């Protein structure tokens, strides 16, 4: 099993798809990496030899921010926005949509489950 950037790549997938299991590598970046290393995108992960895996590992680790480093970088960027008090930072802190979406309705994913508030009681006769 090929292990790149701390991720076990699925053996039966094509190299092009298998690389996308690494956080920070999507389909386009996977194609770039395979082109740089000269590995065919149609090769299965289990069919890669040790030198190809080593080449892939070297390109991923040296040229791209992936996995923990990328997550840390994103968290630090959001924290910076919150610290300097930008509108985006305040929206992050409040748990609201950051990019101008409406919040009167929808925005359920970002705001979380509904908190029911007791309504006005009906007058009994």
Swiss-Prot record:
What SUPFAM superfamilies does the record point to? S13-like H2TH domain
Entry's Gene Ontology molecular function annotations: rRNA binding; structural constituent of ribosome; tRNA binding
The entry sums up its family as follows: Belongs to the universal ribosomal protein uS13 family.
Q: Where is this region: Disordered?
A: 93-125
Basic residues bias spans: 101-125
**Has the keyword Ligase been applied to this entry?**
no
Role, per record: Located at the top of the head of the 30S subunit, it contacts several helices of the 16S rRNA. In the 70S ribosome it contacts the 23S rRNA (bridge B1a) and protein L5 of the 50S subunit (bridge B1b), connecting the 2 subunits; these bridges are implicated in subunit movement. Contacts the tRNAs in the A and P-sites.
Database matches in Pfam families: Ribosomal_S13
Assembly notes: Part of the 30S ribosomal subunit. Forms a loose heterodimer with protein S19. Forms two bridges to the 50S subunit in the 70S ribosome.
The gene for this chain is rpsM
Keyword field: Ribonucleoprotein, Ribosomal protein, RNA-binding, rRNA-binding, tRNA-binding
Cystine pairs annotated here are none
For the keyword Ribonucleoprotein, the answer is: yes
Q: Which GO cellular component terms, listed alphabetically, does the Swiss-Prot or TrEMBL entry include?
A: cytosol; small ribosomal subunit
| Top-rank lineage group of the source organism | Bacteria
Alphabetized PROSITE patterns for the sequence: RIBOSOMAL_S13_1, RIBOSOMAL_S13_2
This one is known as Small ribosomal subunit protein uS13
Q: Which GO terms describe its biological process?
A: translation
